[in-house]
């Protein structure tokens, strides 16, 4: 399956949505050892605005700012929001984009790409240090999405997506 994304292709169908619009992403302050300011965690996702956009032929582009019950805005990790939204929509597939090839057995060798990981493999791969650094939250989001019903997740290198003018 090939992901083709081009601003030129979706410009007329893109619809910007913000998670705080109509409390689409209801959030709360992230509970952490260090105060991270206005960083939030998702309490609830209301999918109606997304479903309405999709049903009307639009491609929703969602800013991952959530809102607390008190009206405070919170920044939500984009991968976390994508995983939660995908599961709430009962999506078949979640695609996360990154700036690296993917999960590598040797982080310095792109030829060691691990093409598939099962949820049950994740603890071992973390313990072995293969899942580390910035890949930890991406893999955790994929695991969470699968546990919440998304059938398949993919982490793709954004540089592999060819963006060009559409054929006219």
Regions found by a protein language model. Give the residues of each.
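Single conserved hydrophobic/aromatic residue that forms the stacking wall/gate
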Residues: 1-5, 10, 161-167
């Amino acid at each position: 399956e090939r992901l083709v994304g081009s601003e030129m292709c979706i410009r007329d169908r893109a619809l910007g949505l913000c998670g705080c619009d109509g409390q689409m992403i209801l959030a709360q302050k992230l509970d952490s050892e260090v105060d991270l300011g206005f960083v939030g965690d998702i309490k609830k996702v209301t999918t109606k605005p997304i479903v309405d956009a999709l049903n009307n032929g639009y491609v929703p582009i969602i800013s991952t700012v959530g809102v607390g019950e008190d009206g405070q805005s919170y920044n939500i990790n984009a991968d976390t929001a994508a995983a939660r939204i995908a599961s709430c929509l009962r999506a078949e597939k979640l695609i996360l984009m990154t700036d690296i090839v993917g999960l590598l057995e040797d982080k310095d060798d792109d030829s060691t790409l691990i093409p598939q990981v099962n949820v049950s493999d994740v603890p071992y791969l973390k313990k072995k240090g293969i899942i580390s650094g910035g890949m930890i939250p991406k893999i955790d989001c994929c695991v969470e999405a699968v546990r919440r019903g998304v059938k398949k997740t993919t982490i793709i290198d954004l540089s592999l997506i060819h963006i060009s003018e559409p054929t006219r």
